[in-house]
């Protein structure tokens, strides 16, 4: 499988500071397999050799995947149309989530791309409760209390664009709140 776009998106997430350090994780589905980022490695320095592989039952074929593997698996198991998951700790979305503030979709692009946002209460990172609550959301753009966002797409580019637009929405909401 060609993972060039996967690596490109991971580096974009890092370069645009949607993730810092070794935070965040990304996966794509290819049939019964998922390709997922490893634990403890910065997305900005990811190579093809670093990418982990698991099957949809959670059997690890290669590498040591992110602690959020269960969240990715549950999403794929519950949503046949989803082939990519992006989880970031983007600054503005995370700040709004920590304050329990809902975001207004203020631009036409946000209405078209994000459509509607789901909000999930806080559950510990990597927990089965987090995985189950995220995977039960109907929406493809999800804000996690104190923990960033998850965006879903038919491919990795679509999931990435939702991340980018959702973080812009949070920035615009911040600006609007401070201009009042």
Swiss-Prot record:
Catalytic reactions on record: L-fuculose 1-phosphate = (S)-lactaldehyde + dihydroxyacetone phosphate
Pfam families linked to this entry: Aldolase_II
Binding site for substrate: 24-25, 39-40, 66-67
Known function: Involved in the biosynthesis of the coenzyme F420 which requires phospholactate produced via the aldol cleavage of L-fuculose 1-phosphate and the NAD(+)-dependent oxidation of (S)-lactaldehyde. Catalyzes the reversible cleavage of L-fuculose 1-phosphate (Fuc1P) to yield dihydroxyacetone phosphate (DHAP) and S-lactaldehyde.
Organism, as annotated: Methanococcus maripaludis (strain DSM 14266 / JCM 13030 / NBRC 101832 / S2 / LL)
Name of the protein in question: L-fuculose phosphate aldolase
Family designation: Belongs to the aldolase class II family. AraD/FucA subfamily.
Major enzyme class: lyase
Metabolic or biological pathway, per its Swiss-Prot or TrEMBL entry: Cofactor biosynthesis; coenzyme F420 biosynthesis
Keyword Membrane part of the UniProt annotation: no
Cofactor(s) in the UniProt record: Zn(2+)
Keywords, in A-Z order: Lyase, Metal-binding, Zinc
Enzyme active site: 68
Description of how the protein assembles with itself and partners: Homotetramer.
Cellular component GO terms, alphabetical: cytosol
InterPro entries: Aldolase_class_II_sugar_metab, Aldolase_II/adducin_N, Aldolase_II/adducin_N_sf, Fuculose-P_aldolase
EC number(s) reported in the record: 4.1.2.17
UniProt cross-references to Gene3D superfamilies, sorted A to Z: Class II aldolase/adducin N-terminal domain
